[in-house]
Amino acid sequence: MTEKSTDVYLGMGAIVHEGGVAFRVWAPHADAVFVKGTFNNWSESADPMKAEEHGTWYTDIPHAKVGDEYKFVLSNGNQKLERMDPYARQVTNSAGNCVIYDPKVFDWEGDRFELPPFNELAIYEMHIGSFFADSDKKPGDFDSAAEKMDHLKRLGVNAIQV
């Protein structure tokens, strides 16, 4: 279970727990912060966050669940800003929405990976959204990048930094 301290879950971003999902974001200059997403019909006011110490904001949403999409809405004076969660573990794409993800469900066992020797590494640094896109209107995604792996392999690339 996720670590809890006096009814407040510890951590940043979307924090999955048995009773829903807690959210925490650092926004020291905001006057107000809300979470909007599929769990509240993208309402910009249904789920306000409470200011904590040191510029963080927190809320716990019992009806939010793994797989729901979300964004933060920050208010500062007359400005209203919609922002992605910098701690999101999954996103729809680099300009899209965050997705609530439970890191405890990932299978870390059974994979055999051997790193090539240091002097043989050919590392390609990749930004998924700009590596390859099917159209100019939408950023690339992991599926479109995966289609081009054979090309990178032919070039001699044996490691990718995402």
List each language-model region with its residue ranges.
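Short proline/glycine-enriched turn/loop motifs at strand-loop junctions of beta-rich domains
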Residues: W26-V33, A64-K65
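Gly/lys/ser-thr-rich phosphate-binding loops in alpha/beta enzymes
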Residues: N40-W42
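Predominantly extracellular/luminal cell-surface or secreted proteins
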Residues: K36-T38, S75
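Catalytic domains of carbohydrate-active enzymes, especially glycoside hydrolases
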Residues: E147-V162
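The feature marks proteins involved in alpha-glucan
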Residues: M1-A22, E44-D47, A51-E125, S130-K137, ...
